[in-house]
Amino acid sequence: YGTQYEQLADCDVVINAAGDVKTSAKDRDGELFVTTDIARTWISRLFNAGFHGVIITISNPCDVVATEIWHITGYNPRKIIGTGTALDSARLRNAIAKRVNVDQKSIGAYMLGEHGNSQFAYWSNVNIAGKPLTQLAQDNPQRFTLDEDETEQDARRGGYRVYAGKECTEYAIAATAARLTQAVLCDEHYAAACSTLLTGEQGESGNYASLPCIVGANGVE
């Protein structure tokens, strides 16, 4: 095994997970200067060596780090992906599943925006087995009417609850990164909420945030 960043140049996917968990105990933004400084130490070396694969970045604040990597490299932004709210979306599906007593694999739901305190649930898109939650709530209000604010907050604060219990949150985000990596390596055209460069969506451009994306061999399609 090599020990130089340049030896990663032929990889199809490189995952950036550098950080300092102690600085993010209260807020994901706490790692800002640590993680962006670390990114600057290796990202140019990787690209100068000829890297042309996909970057998946976990490090927080996820959207800022992804944006910084894009600024440093000038690389195709579709091939720089932040895990963003992919994990938060899974937590939202879990929160809904517990409330309506349906397997979360049957639920379609996304958290969007910043991977942080301002993220929000895309409620108008939530469905169970393809049927909109709004319609289910009309048909069976006792079972399917949710406190949306409470449910959304459960998803938003999920990572902090895990950290409060064991002072780390590595397994779930590792599984999320692995799932996105699989989508790239197998060219799956997989749908996920992940952090990508905004190019006019909702009037915003030039920075990363999470939207529903299709992920394949060329990154975000």
Task: Map each language-model feature to its residues.
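Structural motif
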Residues: 12-13, 54
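N-terminal glycine-rich phosphate/adenylate-binding segment common to multiple enzyme folds
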Residues: 22-24
